[in-house]
């Protein structure tokens, strides 16, 4: 099967999955939407509570697993823990290119859950403004996110934090310097941590956020995550990066270390 045939097949699966989620979980989807919260920190205005100072250290794990598998393993090992998956999100489109047949991390989350049905409900109040001309901050985007509780992943429910990393691949073409990009990346990771702590997450499923098509340096991402989450009320940080031979996995292993699975 060629690339386009496979993409068409994935698009058909995405459409069928979305319809099935609507039939099976419309009530649960509506409840998750109602209990979701949009976070922002822009132009000196923010609605994220400053985390209380802590001297606690999180346990750090590096797993050769996709995000959903990692969350399920964590749930099996710690069934009473609150688990949140970081969605490596598109800034402009709910579910990224899920419905067009793409299969990056966000799209994979949508294929495994009712997340796409949830994010569609935010198109007008969240994504539409991001698609307006001049709204992308030269593709660095802004510190904006959606925290959604109880997203259904088959027999499990996990919270999902939807947040786009700065898009260095695009930003570099708009005259953005590497220093500007790194400053935005570090600020966004601080933003993510504050949201996770505000929502009293026990286990956060993170990863090589932004180090795919967005072009972030995985070593830089790993360094900023390691620095920012050094002290945290979150008990366990799982960096979920499929393929131990990948550049991303090797970068995280060198910088973060932790228990490897």
Language-model regions: role of each:
Residues 1-261:
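Macrodomain-like recognition of ADP-ribose-binding/processing modules
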């Amino acid at each position: 099967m060629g690339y386009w045939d496979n993409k068409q097949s994935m698009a058909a699966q995405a459409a069928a999955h979305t319809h099935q989620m609507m039939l099976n979980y419309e009530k649960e989807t509506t409840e998750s939407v109602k209990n979701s919260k949009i976070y922002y920190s822009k132009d000196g205005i923010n609605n994220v509570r400053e985390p209380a100072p802590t001297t606690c250290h999180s346990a750090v794990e590096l797993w050769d697993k996709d995000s959903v598998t990692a969350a399920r393993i964590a749930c099996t090992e710690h069934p009473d823990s609150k688990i949140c998956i970081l969605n490596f999100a598109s800034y402009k489109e709910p579910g990224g290119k899920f419905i067009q047949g793409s299969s990056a991390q966000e799209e994979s989350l949508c294929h495994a859950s009712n997340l796409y049905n949830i994010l569609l409900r935010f198109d007008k109040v969240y994504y539409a403004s991001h698609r307006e001309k001049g709204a992308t901050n030269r593709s660095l985007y802004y510190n904006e996110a959606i925290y959604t509780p109880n997203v259904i992943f088959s027999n499990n429910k996990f919270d999902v934090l939807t947040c786009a990393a700065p898009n260095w691949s695009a930003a570099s073409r708009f005259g953005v310097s590497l220093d500007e990009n790194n400053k935005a990346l570090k600020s966004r990771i601080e933003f993510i941590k504050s949201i996770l702590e505000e929502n009293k997450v026990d286990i956060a499923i993170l990863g090589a956020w932004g180090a795919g098509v967005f072009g972030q340096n995985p070593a830089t991402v790993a360094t900023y995550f390691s620095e920012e989450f050094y002290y945290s009320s979150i008990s366990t940080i799982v960096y979920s990066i499929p393929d131990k031979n990948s550049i991303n996995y090797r970068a995280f292993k060198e910088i973060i270390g932790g228990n490897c699975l």
